[in-house]
Amino acid sequence: MSKVYDWFEERLEIQAIADDITSKYVPPHVNIFYCLGGITLTCFLVQVATGFAMTFYYRPTVTEAFASVQYIMTEANFGWLIRSVHRWSASMMVLMMILHVFRVYLTGGFKKPRELTWVTGVVLGVLTASFGVTGYSLPRDQIGYWAVKIVTGVPEAIPVIGSPLVELLRGSASVGQSTLTRFYSLHTFVLPLLTAVFMLMHFPMIRKQGISGPL
């Protein structure tokens, strides 16, 4: 085993990386509220795992979506547990994200030199809200249908570009199969990819700049 470790150590300097991670200074004023960002990340990872598991059974069509969700909840092995964890974790992720934003704002964590960290965090917050909107429509039940109809109808109040923007969101003049396909693609591919990209920007900046000092 030591030979294998030595082989990787010689090429990747694993020990130096481990020392850098474990020896990072943590300011004495840090408390449990500084863990909210990490909890949000944990919820996101749970979302990815449980969401991926449900893709094996979910069918993104207007005629089969609701039935496939029922199948997950009543017949698929541990499907009820996986979907329930997905829903609970989604709510927890939104709550932790909101509390994290408040904590950063109230402690001045957005000030120089952490402006870009704040900007990427705000983008991650918008992406989190987008997860909620797109995911809400996927069961294709009454609540999801009307929620999507209302949300996608909001831009119609914008002069000139309102109607084309609504049609772009829905894929047609009304909420239908094109809307479900768009939201499913956004929820399972586009948003997770964008979230991962901005997280890869967000965390190294925190690592580089460290935790902000007390007020």
Curated annotation (Swiss-Prot):
One Pfam family, please name it.
Cytochrome_B
> What topology does the record note for this protein and the membrane?
Multi-pass membrane protein
Question: Is Electron transport one of the keywords UniProt gives this record?
Answer: yes
- Listed transmembrane segments: 32-52, 90-110, 116-136, 186-206
Q: Where in the cell is it found?
A: Plastid, Chloroplast thylakoid membrane
Highest taxon of source: Eukaryota
Residues holding heme c: C35
Location (main, coarse): plastid
What would be an example GO MF term here? electron transporter, transferring electrons within cytochrome b6/f complex of photosystem II activity
Question: What's in the GO CC field?
Answer: chloroplast thylakoid membrane; membrane
Q: Which InterPro entries match?
A: Cyt_b/b6_N (IPR005797), Cyt_B6_PetB (IPR023530), Cytb/b6-like_sf (IPR027387), Cytochrome_b_N_euk/bac (IPR048259), Di-haem_cyt_TM (IPR016174)
Q: How is the cofactor bound?
A: Binds 2 heme b groups non-covalently with two histidine residues as axial ligands.
Sorted alphabetically, which SUPFAM superfamilies does this protein's record hold?
Transmembrane di-heme cytochromes
Residues annotated as binding heme b 2 are H86, H187
The UniProt entry, under NCBIfam families, shows:
PRK03735.1
Family affiliation: Belongs to the cytochrome b family. PetB subfamily.
State the remark under miscellaneous: Heme 1 (or BH or b566) is high-potential and absorbs at about 566 nm, and heme 2 (or BL or b562) is low-potential and absorbs at about 562 nm.
Give a short account of what the protein does: Component of the cytochrome b6-f complex, which mediates electron transfer between photosystem II (PSII) and photosystem I (PSI), cyclic electron flow around PSI, and state transitions.
- The entry's protein name is Cytochrome b6
From which organism does this entry originate?
Vitis vinifera (Grape)
Q: Which gene encodes it?
A: petB
